[in-house]
């Protein structure tokens, strides 16, 4: 195995490597905090990530993804929230998550208003709700003391588009498992070096034996699935199933979630 590619194994995708990326991000974000202090926490998949790189800022997902932290909460702390918000808040309040701690600001997609309100109520850092590209650029440059670079934006956009295209190719033209594809899509974002992330996907594209014809793929929808994907995968019986993130009418959701869902899961 090299750089997350199992060249001689049954599957090329090393899921342990992908899961470990989040732990690696702890170290990378801490090192960044101690040097340039240019990490921004993000929540939501609809943010124009290329603009962060254009402003010299590294975007990293911030939601808590496990229940381990719950035991460190004070009585009734974060009660009444879904597991996603509860995990994130307890990590934030106890300062036990290096990613959350290292962020100079948090940028959130305007979707879950409960997440937005909870974060604002528990941090003195800037919590910015994304509205448009121009305002995001101005906010990033002002807070981080950087300048917008159009060349950096174009390069980052090219890398992100390439990765998105490879993911689409893997989704419809390979027989990777539901869990493998989910981790590729959602956990590769913890690879904070965008150049290394692109090279990883280049190696995947070179080594995966793609099918000639598009496969018939089923989709299972989930709310904020980084934390409950194992529970969702346990109920998936077809390898040609992909977990997608939605905000309304999801197949799987959490207790206390503000959005509608069909079946409850948890951390």
Indicate residue ranges for each PLM-predicted region.
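Short alpha-helical segments and helix-capping/turn motifs at coil-helix boundaries
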Residues: 24-32, 43-47, 89-96, 114, ...
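Redox- and metal-dependent alpha/beta enzyme cores, enriched for Fe-S-associated oxidoreductases
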Residues: 45-46, 51-65, 70-73, 218-267
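Extended, charge-rich low-complexity interaction segments
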Residues: 89-107, 150-166, 266-267
């Amino acid at each position: 195995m090299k750089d997350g590619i199992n060249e001689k194994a049954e599957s090329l995708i090393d899921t342990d490597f992908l899961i470990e990326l989040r732990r690696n991000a702890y170290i990378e974000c801490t090192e960044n905090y101690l040097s340039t202090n240019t990490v921004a926490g993000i929540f939501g998949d609809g943010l124009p990530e290329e603009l962060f790189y254009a402003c010299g800022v590294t975007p990293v997902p911030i939601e808590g993804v496990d229940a381990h932290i719950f035991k460190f909460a004070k009585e009734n702390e974060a009660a009444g929230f879904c597991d996603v918000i509860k995990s994130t808040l307890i990590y934030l309040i106890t300062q036990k998550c290096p990613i959350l701690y290292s962020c100079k600001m948090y940028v959130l997609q305007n979707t879950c208003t409960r997440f937005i309100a909870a974060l604002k109520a528990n941090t003195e850092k800037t919590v910015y709700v994304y509205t448009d590209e121009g305002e995001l650029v101005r906010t990033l440059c002002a807070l981080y003391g950087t300048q917008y670079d159009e060349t950096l934006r174009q390069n980052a956009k090219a890398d992100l588009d390439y990765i998105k295209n490879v993911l689409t190719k893997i989704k419809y033209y390979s027989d990777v498992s539901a869990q493998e594809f989910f981790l590729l899509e959602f956990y590769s974002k913890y690879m904070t070096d965008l150049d290394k992330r692109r090279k990883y996907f280049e190696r995947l594209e070179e080594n995966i034996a793609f099918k000639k014809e598009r496969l018939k793929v089923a989709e299972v929808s989930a709310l904020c699935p980084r934390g409950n994907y194992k529970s969702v995968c346990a109920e998936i019986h077809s390898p040609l199933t992909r977990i997608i993130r939605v905000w309304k009418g999801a197949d799987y959701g959490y207790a206390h979630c503000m959005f509608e869902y069909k079946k409850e899961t948890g951390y």
